[in-house]
From Swiss-Prot:
It comes from Anopheles gambiae. The gene is Tret1. It is found in: Cell membrane. This is Facilitated trehalose transporter Tret1. It comes from the Eukaryota. Residues 1-326, 398-411, 456-460, 510-572, 631-636, 690-703, 759-793 are cytoplasmic. One of its GO terms (biological process) is transmembrane transport. Pfam families: Sugar_tr. Residues 99-148, 213-235 are annotated as: Disordered.
C-alpha cells in the first residue's frame, strides 16, 4: 500500500511546487526573473569549462526538498542555489548530488562540466577508444598495401610528364637544324605530290623513335609496405641510351626520383646531343616566308609531328598551319580579267569625245551640223546618264547579283555604239551617248564590288586595279584609233569591244557573299571553291562570310535609307564620297575629254593628236605601276604621292597659261604643257584614279554595299558631269590658268582629307575592315593567322 501511495504523494508535491512557481511568476514576473538569474549564477559550477546555462545542476538533496512545505519553499527560494522547473508529465527521477571531481575527470574535453555521474559515459568513452585503436590498426595495415601502388602511380605520372617535356624541348632544339633535307627533297621532286610523298615517308621514319608506344616502363622493384618517398635513392642514371638511337628509350621507374634534377638534366642533354648528332642529316623543318603587303610573316608549313597518346590510345598529332588558303591565282585572274574588259569599254566611252568631236564638227565628214553647244552636250550627257546608272545599279546588284548586273551592260553597250555609228542627226548621237553613259554608271558601280568580294586580301590591291588599267587601255585605244578613224568608224570599233567581255562573263561565278546574303550557302561554297582552287579548304572563309552577314543583319534597320544614315554606316559612306569628290574635282575628266582642245589653246609645238596618244600611253603605264606598288606601299602612301604630283603639275599648268595670256614668250617652253600633262596623268593614275573605286568595294559595309555604292557612283558621275559640262564656261570666265589653279587648290584640300580621314586597308579582309569601320573591331596580332589543328591518325 505504501508503495502505491508513495508515487502519488511524490507527484502531488511536484504539482504543488509548479503551481507556486507559476503564481510567483504571475504576481511579479520581473522580480521572479531576476531571482532565477541570481540563483542560476550561484549554482554554476566553478569548473573552468562551465560557461553556459545549458545544464541544470542541483546542490541540494531531493529528500530535503520533499520535506519542506510549498509555502516555506517559496520563502526560502533565494537561499537555494537553484530550483528546477519540472513539467507535470516529467517522469525522470531526481538527480542525486555527486562530487564535482568525478564529473571533471570523465569529461575534461567537454564544454560544460556536469556534476552527475553516469557509467554510460565511461563505457562510451572506453568503447570509442577501443574502436579508434582498432580503426588505426586497420588503417595502417590497409594503407601500407595501397601506399606502394600510390607511389608507383605517382612515379608513372612523373615519368610521363618528364618524357613529354623532354620530347617537346628536344623538338625545339632540333627545329633549326632541319632546313636542308626538305630543300633537297623539293629540288629532287618532280611535282608537289612527289614532294609530299617523300616528306611524309621521311617524317614517318623520323618519328618512329619518338612514338610514345615505343617507350616501356619497368616496375620490377616493388617498394616495401613501410617505405615512403624519402626511402628511394637513385642508384643509376635516369635514362639508358642504346647505341641505336631509333630503339625505344627505357625509363626505369625504380630509379626515378623527382628531386634528382641534376641527373635528369644531364641525362636529357646527353640524349639530346647524341640524337641530334646522329640524325643531323635526317631531321628537317622548313619555314616559308610569305609577304603580305609591307608585312612579312613567317608561316609554318612543316613542323615535327610530336605524338601524344590520347585517352583512346591513339597518337595525337598537333601541327601548325596557316589559317588562310594558299593563293590560287589563275581563277582569280580570270575573274578580274573578265570584268576588266567591261572597264575597257567604259574607258573607251569616256575618251570618245576628245578625238571624235574634231571630226564630228567637220561638215565635210558629217552630214549634220554639230554646234559648240550640242558638242558640249555630246561630252556632258554621258556622265549625266552615268549618274542615273549609278542610282539604278545599286538595287540591281542586290537583287540580280553582281555578275548578272555586269553582264546586263554588255548588250546595251553594243546598241549604244551602233546608234552613234549610224547616226543621221545629232539627236541619235545624244541618245547613243546617254545609253552608253547609263551602262558606264552601272558598270563602274558593280565592277569594284565584284572584285572586292571575290579576290583574296593578299592580291586584292593588284587585281583590284585591273579594271582601272583596262580602262586606261580603252582610253589609249580611243586616242590611237582617233588619229586614223573619224567619229563614225570610232563608234563601230567601240561596238566590237563588248563582245569578248560578254563571252568571258559566262565563265566566272557569282560572288560568294551575294549567295550568302540570299541564304544559298551551297552555291556560295561552290563559287568559293572555284575561286580558291579545288584543294583549298573554304569552310573557314565561308563561316567568316556568314558571320559577317549575320552581324550586319542584326544591326540592320527596316529601311535602306535609314541604314545609310546610321552613324556607323555614315562614316565609310562619307569617306567614299570624299574620295570621289576629290577624284573628279582634280580636273582629270576635263583633261581627258578636252585633251586636243587644251593642247591647241596651249600653242604647243607638238602635234595635238600625238600629244593625246602620249598622254594615253603614260596613263596606261602608270596604272600598271600602281598595280605593283599598291600591295607594297599601301593605299594611303599612293594617295599622298598622287595628290602631291597633281598639285605641282596643276599649279605649273596654271602658271604657263597665265604667262601665255599675259603676252609672255613661251615658245621656248612649248614642251612644258605636255610634260606637265604626263606627270599629272602619272600622278592621277598612281592613286586618285584607281584607289577611290577600289576602296569603295572595301570600306563600305556588306549590308549597305549595294545602296551605298550606288550613292557613291551617282555622286562621282554628278561631279564628272559638272566638271565636263562647265569646263568650257569656267575657262571662258577665269581663263585656263584660273581653272587649273582652282583644281590645284582643291587637290590641296584633298591631301588633308586623306591624311585625316582615309583608313589603310592593305592586307585586311573585308570582314576586318567592316568591323573596324563599324566600331566592333578586335585587334589581332599576326599570330592569329596561325592556329593548331589537331587530328588523330
Amino acid at each position: 500500500m505504501n508503495r502505491k501511495v508513495g508515487p502519488v504523494l511524490e507527484y502531488s508535491r511536484r504539482f504543488s511546487r509548479v503551481l507556486c512557481a507559476l503564481r510567483d511568476e504571475i504576481r511579479d514576473p520581473l522580480q521572479y526573473g531576476y531571482q532565477r538569474v541570481n540563483t542560476a549564477e550561484g549554482s554554476l559550477s566553478t569548473s573552468t569549462t562551465a560557461t553556459s546555462l545549458d545544464t541544470i545542476v542541483l546542490d541540494t538533496n531531493a529528500e530535503d526538498l520533499a520535506s519542506v512545505p510549498p509555502r516555506t519553499l517559496q520563502h526560502h527560494q533565494p537561499q537555494r542555489t537553484f530550483s528546477p522547473i519540472l513539467e507535470t508529465d516529467d517522469t525522470n527521477p531526481f538527480l542525486e548530488p555527486v562530487e564535482k571531481a568525478k564529473s571533471k575527470s570523465s569529461l575534461k574535453s567537454s564544454r560544460v562540466s556536469f556534476d552527475q555521474e553516469d557509467d554510460r559515459f565511461d563505457e562510451d568513452e572506453n568503447s570509442f577508444r577501443k574502436q579508434r585503436e582498432h580503426f588505426q590498426k586497420h588503417k595502417s595495415h590497409s594503407t601500407s598495401e595501397h601506399k606502394s601502388q600510390l607511389i608507383k602511380e605517382l612515379r608513372h605520372l612523373l615519368a610521363t610528364d618528364n618524357r613529354r617535356q623532354f620530347q617537346g624541348k628536344k623538338h625545339v632544339s632540333l627545329d633549326v637544324k632541319s632546313a636542308k633535307v626538305l630543300e633537297q627533297l623539293l629540288k629532287a621532286s618532280s611535282s608537289s605530290d612527289d614532294f609530299e610523298g617523300q616528306r611524309k615517308e621521311f617524317q614517318e621514319r623520323k618519328h618512329k623513335s619518338l612514338d610514345a608506344r615505343h617507350i616501356s616502363f619497368k616496375f620490377d622493384k616493388e617498394p616495401s609496405p613501410s617505405s615512403s618517398d624519402e626511402d628511394f635513392e637513385p642508384s643509376t642514371s635516369l635514362l639508358r641510351i642504346d647505341a641505336d638511337i631509333t630503339k625505344p628509350v627505357i625509363i626505369d621507374l625504380k630509379d626515378l626520383d623527382s628531386s634528382d634534377e641534376e641527373d635528369y638534366i644531364s641525362s636529357r642533354k646527353h640524349f639530346q646531343q647524341s640524337k641530334s648528332m646522329s640524325t643531323d642529316s635526317r631531321k628537317s623543318i622548313r619555314f616559308l616566308e610569305m609577304e603580305m603587303g609591307t608585312k612579312e610573316e613567317n608561316m609554318r608549313t612543316a613542323v615535327p609531328f610530336v605524338r601524344q597518346i590520347t585517352e583512346e590510345g591513339k597518337p595525337k598529332l598537333e601541327v601548325y598551319r596557316p589559317t588562310t588558303n594558299p593563293i590560287y591565282i589563275w581563277t582569280q585572274v580570270l575573274a578580274a580579267l573578265s570584268v576588266s574588259l567591261g572597264s575597257m569599254v567604259v574607258g573607251f566611252s569616256s575618251a570618245y569625245t576628245s578625238p571624235a568631236l574634231v571630226s564630228m564638227k567637220d561638215r565635210n565628214i558629217t552630214s549634220f551640223e554639230v554646234t559648240d553647244q550640242s558638242g558640249s552636250w555630246v561630252g556632258g550627257i554621258m556622265p549625266l546618264a552615268g549618274l542615273a546608272g549609278g542610282i539604278l545599279g545599286g538595287p540591281m546588284i542586290e537583287y540580280l547579283g553582281r555578275k548578272n548586273t555586269i553582264l546586263a551592260t554588255a548588250t546595251p553597250f553594243i546598241i549604244s555604239w551602233l546608234l552613234i555609228g549610224c547616226a543621221t542627226h545629232v539627236a541619235m548621237v545624244l541618245v547613243g551617248r546617254a545609253l552608253s553613259g547609263l551602262c558606264v554608271g552601272i558598270a563602274s558601280l558593280s565592277l569594284p564590288v565584284y572584285l572586292g568580294e571575290t579576290v583574296q586580301p593578299e592580291v586584292r590591291g593588284t587585281l583590284g586595279l585591273l579594271p582601272t588599267a583596262f580602262g586606261n587601255i580603252g582610253i589609249l585605244l580611243c586616242f590611237v584609233a582617233g588619229k586614223y578613224l573619224d567619229w563614225s568608224g570610232l563608234a563601230f570599233l567601240g561596238a566590237a569591244l563588248p563582245i569578248p567581255f560578254l563571252l568571258l562573263m559566262f565563265l566566272i561565278p557569282e560572288t560568294p557573299r551575294w549567295y550568302v546574303s540570299r541564304n544559298r550557302e551551297d552555291r556560295a561554297r561552290k563559287a568559293l571553291q572555284w575561286l580558291r582552287g579545288r584543294k583549298a579548304d573554304v569552310e573557314p572563309e565561308l563561316k567568316g562570310i556568314s558571320k559577317s552577314h549575320q552581324d550586319a543583319e542584326r544591326h540592320a534597320s527596316s529601311s535602306a535609307m535609314l541604314d545609310l544614315l546610321n552613324k556607323a554606316n555614315l562614316k565609310p559612306l562619307l569617306i567614299s564620297l570624299g574620295l570621289m569628290f576629290f577624284q573628279q574635282l582634280s580636273g582629270i575628266n576635263a583633261v581627258i575629254f578636252y585633251t586636243v582642245q587644251i593642247f591647241q589653246s596651249a600653242g604647243s609645238t607638238i602635234d595635238e593628236k600625238l600629244c593625246t596618244i602620249i598622254v594615253g600611253v603614260v596613263n596606261f603605264i602608270a596604272t600598271f605601276i600602281a598595280t605593283v606598288l599598291i600591295d607594297r606601299l599601301g593605299r594611303k602612301i599612293l594617295l599622298y604621292i598622287s595628290d602631291v604630283a597633281m598639285i605641282i603639275t596643276l599649279m605649273t599648268l596654271g602658271t604657263f597659261f597665265y604667262m601665255k595670256n599675259n603676252g609672255d614668250d613661251v615658245s621656248e617652253i612649248g614642251w612644258l604643257p605636255l610634260a606637265a600633262f604626263v606627270v599629272f596623268v602619272v600622278g592621277f593614275s598612281l592613286g586618285f584614279g584607281p584607289i577611290p573605286w577600289l576602296m569603295m568595294g572595301e570600306i563600305l559595309p556588306g549590308k549597305i554595299r549595294g545602296s551605298a555604292a550606288s550613292v557613291a557612283t551617282a555622286f562621282n558621275w554628278s561631279c564628272t558631269f559638272v566638271v565636263t559640262k562647265t569646263f568650257a564656261d569656267i575657262t571662258a570666265s577665269i581663263g585656263n590658268h584660273g581653272a587649273f589653279w582652282m583644281f590645284g587648290s582643291i587637290c590641296i584640300v584633298g591631301l588633308l582629307f586623306v591624311i585625316v580621314y582615309v583608313p589603310e586597308t592593305q592586307g585586311k579582309s573585308l570582314e576586318d575592315i567592316e568591323r573596324k569601320m563599324m566600331g566592333r573591331v578586335r585587334r589581332m596580332s599576326s599570330v592569329a593567322n596561325i592556329k593548331p589543328l589537331s587530328f588523330n591518325m
